[in-house]
Amino acid sequence: LNTKGGVVDKVVINNFADRNGNKNVTLFQGKDQNLNYTFATKDGYISTADLFFTPSEVTDTTVTFTAEAAAGKTLTIKYVLGNEYMLHTSISATGMAGILNPSVNTVDINWQQRCAQQEKGFTFENRYATLTYHKSKGGTDYLSETSEKIDEVIEDKIDWVAFKNQFFSAVMIAKTDFGTNNTLTSIPQEKGTGYLKQYKARLKTTFDPTGAQPTQLDFYYGPNDFRLLQQMESQSNFGKDLELERLVYLGWPLFRVINRWFTIYVFDWLTGFGFNMGVVLILITLLLKGITFPLVKKSYLSSAKMRVLKP
């Protein structure tokens, strides 16, 4: 965490190796990520990026950052580390009624990240690096993974935005929603730079200038693991059907159904025996071929007969 701006400055995901052989994956650090909250005042704006915060109530799992505008007038950002990979965040104002614009009940959020390359193969990893978002009415969508998209306007209300690479994601989740007409940007990076995409999200969510109700956000920094992402919904405590597991690509519609309701369960069952990943994948492949063989048997026999009869 950084006292300048009061934001997360570096995220390391333990027990996952990166392309350089490091035992832990650094999702981002320093200038690779920027997060700024902007509040409307009676004569302009206050941006957290311009403020220095003082930490207090520091424990192994919590910290409170406070920036003082004047005596008794403060902005507070509180972080609580949840189980696994979830970080709970609340933002509130105290005694700021004379400074903040009482007619503006939203906060502008500007979030940017350069998505770092984690795998040795750039092209394949880049194909699955996408800026993904979840609509409040249900379902997810994403910006193109191959072409440049700048300030794409999302008219629907959205619950979360994910800066995703192939195996890991940084996700921002709003307790209420991010309203309408948010803008999202995804710019592919050149091979050899060490980065996959430049992501940017300009969002807006509710904020109480009186300080009576804090703005609540959750951040997920972790692997794109189907079962784990399903569990995150209960950890967010927002009471929403977040569908974070949709961050895991399961293929085209037909294959998605097969993978969702068959392959994943078989995978869980086989890994429960302690087999390594390579063995599990081989067994699943053999099992799927065995199941589909009766369906393609006639085609194989017909093809074989044609080869025999061919002059």
Regions found by a protein language model. Name each.
Residues 73, 93, 210, 287-311:
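Membrane-interface amphipathic helices and adjacent TM-edge segments
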Residues 222-276:
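Interfacial loop/helix-cap signal at membrane boundaries in integral membrane proteins
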Residues 84, 259, 263, 306-309:
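Active-site-proximal structural scaffolding
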